[in-house]
Amino acid sequence: MLTANTIIIDVRTPAEFAEGHVEGSINLDLESGQFEAELPNLDPAQPYIVYCRSGRRSGVAVEIMKASGFTQITDYQTLENAANKTGLPIIE
């Protein structure tokens, strides 16, 4: 669920992110190691929405976050699903 405190994370590559992303999302590429490198800088008490292209990478990211003590995580799987469920536009 989207609140004023929700952080939206796009775990796709920077090239994919540049092609289109949910407004206000941050890009933390799972495959390059950027996601795991930045994880200690994220607040586990905040709510998060995670998405990618197909749901595979976002699912992996959510499992990593859960193992690191994050509890308020929603996996919206795809860019389109994240945009629809949050009501936010896709920025290209």
Regions found by a protein language model. Name each.
Residues Y51:
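Short, surface-exposed ligand- or partner-binding patches at beta-edge/loop junctions that are enriched
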